[in-house]
Amino acid sequence: KHWSRGLGDVYKRQVEHCRKVNKSFQTQIAVVETILKNNQSILYRSNPCDLQLNKEDINKINFNNYAAVFISGTALSGEPSRNAVLVASKLTSDLKIPLIIDLDYRPYNWESDTIKSDVYKEIMNEMDIIIGNDLEFNVADNSTNGLELAKVYIKKKPSVIVYKMGEEGSKVFTKENESQYGTFNVEAIKPTGAGDAFNGGFISSLYNGLSLEDAAIRGSANAAIVVTRVGCSSAMPNNQELEKFINQNQKEL
């Protein structure tokens, strides 16, 4: 298991639950054009290894060690990962540990539109925070009226729902009210990483005790920075860069 110890040394993460999977399963390939205008990105996902997450992997995790659990909707797109994630969400919900999901819809692997909707709605019932864009809420509702689905679910268990609308900004729903936030005007070179960047800025801000408004602004700023840089995780700003960007550009919101 030297490979997993190496991961732990590099990324400073617990690796006890890591395991090798059959070599027939693959990591994903991303192909991105380097031209600035009208660029296209392609994610090739054939037998991806991350969808091999199973219930045995979940059983190795002591969820009591964590302040919250974050779920990517991509993990719901195929088995055995889908069932493993549903099991994990129910376990953490029973433990009263905050659950967060990025709906993170990808069109591949899903069997049908009906299954997409059924699975998304099942797991959304367990969540404390739901984050998704207009397309993803449409998919979850199997309709073109995803905004209404967000309004329905804020009356259920979730305490916060973020409904992202691309260049039009985002709506943030709570039990008490609905707020809308704009975006920062930047020259993007690619969309890759914007969602992860928003999530990182938004959730880390809430974790550090900031207001929902500040969290939404920091999430949007984080995303705006990342789309102007090459790469994804390597493009993420540090806190100093984020604060500087917000101070220089907040008047746009």
Model-derived regions, located:
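Short beta-strand scaffold segments in enzyme catalytic cores
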Residues: 29-33, 169-172
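A generic structural signal for short hydrophobic patches within well-formed alpha-helices
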Residues: 58, 76, 106, 137-138, ...
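Hydrophobic beta-strand scaffold residues
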Residues: 15-17, 99-101, 131
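Single conserved hydrophobic/aromatic residue that forms the stacking wall/gate
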Residues: 1-11
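A glycine-rich helix N-cap at a beta->alpha junction
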Residues: 12-24
